Amino acid sequence: MAKTNSYKKVIAGTMTAAMVAGVVSPVAAAGKSFPDVPAGHWAEDSINYLVDKGAIVGKPDGTYGPTESIDRASAAVIFTKILNLPVDENAQPSFKDAKNLWSSKYIAAVEKAGVVKGDGKDNFYPEGKIDRASFASMLVGAYNLKEKVDGTLVTKFDDLRGHWGEEKANILVNLGISVGTGGKWEPNKSVSRAEAAQFIALTDKKYAKPENSDAKVTNVAATEPTQLTLTGTGLNKLTAEDVTLEGNKAIALEASKDGKSAVVTLSGKIAPNKELPVKVKGNTFIVKYVYEVKKLRVEQLTFDDDRADQAVVFKLNDEKGNADIEYLDIAGHDVKFVANNLDGTPANIFEGGTAESTTGKLAVGIAEGKYKVEVQVTKRGGITVSNTGIIEVKNLDAEATAIKDVVFAVDTDKAGVNYAKPLSGTDFTLNSKTLVAGEKAGIHKVVAQINKENKVVDPSAISLKSSNPGVISVKNGEIKAEAAGSATLTVKVGDVTKTFDFVVKTDTRKLTTVKANPDQLKVVDGKELPVTFVTTDQYGDPFGANSGAIKEVFPQTGVVKVLDVTTTNEGSIGTSSIKVKGENVGAGTIHFQNPNASGEGYGSLHVEVTKSNIGHEAPRLELVSKAGQKGEAADTTLGAGNTVAYQLSNYTTEGVYADAADLAGYEFRVGNDKIASAKIEGKTLKVTGKTAGVTDVILTKDGATAGHATITVTQENIQITSVKFKDVEVEQFENRKVNIDRVLDVVKSDKDDVLNGIKLNISTEHKVRIVDEGTEQGKVYLDRNDNATFDGNDVALGYVTAVKSNDTVSKEGNDLFKFLTDETATNKNDVFKGVTTAFGDKGTVIFKVMKDRVAPTTEYGTKAVTINVIKEEI
């Protein structure tokens, strides 16, 4: 059967290291030579290399079959051998075309391990062949070759331009693994066994993961709360993946040059005074971490005189982070803070008006000045370690240095806009800076930087004025759109200002877009899943759609029969979470249209309904907002005063979300109830942030843990303040890559790349990273837990996007011709691929760093790259 490009991508995604290992037949094991691979054969050295490595299989008749193609079933067998996956002799894969075959147990093994996927229609195509583009993609993934690329990728072969495998093939060319065939690359040509051997051998010689069979670990010790130290030999051949431990994860391993010791960094802290099994290469070591305080240093900081939730900070030993009093308590240590005035008399600066404290939390309303604070850490029944530092107290409230964020809202009921609390009635926040003539608006919130912290400004400290009262007038903080035109609004707090360019239109707001998140829903028949619907007008602002404003056109498959999208809830106009029920097994798309005769489309939602088949796994603790997104972290960050909801989710044996478990009989525990509180309501566990900090929430039943989440409560609004772009010149030559690397300093990583040149409104040692692939490609975030992956503890900062200018011209078939002039939530340009210049290109590619990728008014900075490769008529 002929393969489509989509099918080719499936092949590429199913095997990440095919033919790197395997079982050598008796004939192959006897020697390197095969009768059909004569001396001097162009692939002889590569075939011999893989024979030596035990990575290829000779045929029963003793031949190699260099001209034969590789099928997917054979690759599944090899992949199983590579990863030493457990093989169940009676196992059958879920793919309907891969059952009861000689290779079924191997296909089942790689499917269970998450290595392979089908075509989305329960097919695996075990006899399907692999083309060169798919094989290139396979090699790039198996050896992480994208990270090895030096410089900009260039498309040297015309038959690669616009092909789905262009980038992967270019990586092989860049690294010298492939040189093409007779001036072409032939991406659609099937790969022969000889070609496969050549590809793999060249790649393996350069980039194979070091063999760690010689590594021998003799001891594992916990040397810090988040650090293990290994001793032995050959440890420089280990990676973090070789170290596993329950309830924690090894995220980095750094070995000494002689390989006799290695330091392993963990993602979380080790529980003190408890035995912990640590596995290294299958061997188990019992580690018991006894926490000892050897050094202590009080941080000399400046505090505000009347701010709540401030505390003295100190560091222990040589640890990077601040000391954790809760962890010290678990480790058997008591902490005591003693404050004195500089003359030695007691200073009652702690909570409760005392001079001594066990938490270090400061009182509200402290006299300005300097104080000596001694911190004493005493091991119960043991010694005390102490240190004294000087802290200073000032009035920092009025010292705003910058306005970081201003939120405007439309006052639809002419009753004023609520400040720093939920909006009332049908008022809505503005995404754009557009008003319609006659509308009234107001400031919903202003956040200013005060002593390097972001605080919501008291409304009495804000002043507002308009540059053009004939277009937009301002009176007592009330904004009114008087007439069509433009005006600049200036917001002032203290001595700092921030300006906003507004336009006033005369076109009445109307519904233009309905976006569903997720826009592809997978649900069990008879069950419901929440979908967030966002409705916006022609200006990109929230639009409250009432019942009847949207015509839901249901698919004939009957997967969904009832849905009424309305977004008029008070406080969240334009956004609503609505449960969608799966009715019949099958798939189909719900289209959202104008109910009037024009019937223009607003958006769509694709729904796949699967049969009910509840599995026997323990339910998973998930955020209600992410119910059904199996694998999403339960950890989250929320602002003080905000609430998040959790549930225990049941899944089918196929991994499809079924429903929420009943929480009757469950209990919860909050690690620090001063940071957050929790309560169970029906099937929901609700957690509310109280004060800034980090704590754990644990759900239990009959004493056993049923779920766990780490909650980070913050009172800050971290955001980008400026972007440093590279200097760029006009691109006048063909085959030049214009992508994110052209304009921004991107440092490659095995996970999410580091993005340099992004300045934030806070001082931090954490890296700013960017997601380089997947649905969230281009997302910029602060990697707070330093694991190079965006999860619940990290802070989303915005996106890097790229579009071409409207006046750009290009020849059909060129990258620039296909590049979008405008992005939508579902149709985006690939900023990492960018465009490769070609004859006929003339125009501009504009790279933007934005808070909201589909809201042009939220940009933090832009850089334009001019392209002029006109050498022939278009």
UniProtKB/Swiss-Prot annotation:
How far does the signal peptide extend, from start to end residue?
1-30
Compartment(s) of residence: Secreted, Cell wall, S-layer
UniProt keyword annotations, A-Z: Cell wall, Repeat, S-layer, Secreted, Signal
Statement: the UniProt record of this protein carries the keyword Repeat: yes
Can you give the residue ranges of the SLH domain?
31-93, 94-151, 152-214
Keyword Secreted attached: yes
List, alphabetically, the Pfam families matched. Answer: SLH (PF00395)
> Which is a Gene Ontology cellular component entry for this protein?
extracellular region
Read off the InterPro entries from this record.
Cell_Envelope_Struct_Comp, SLH_dom
Q: Briefly state the protein's biological role.
A: The S-layer is a paracrystalline mono-layered assembly of proteins which coat the surface of bacteria.
Protein name per its UniProtKB record: S-layer protein
From the broadest rank down, the organism's phylogenetic lineage runs: Bacteria, Bacillati, Bacillota, Bacilli, Bacillales
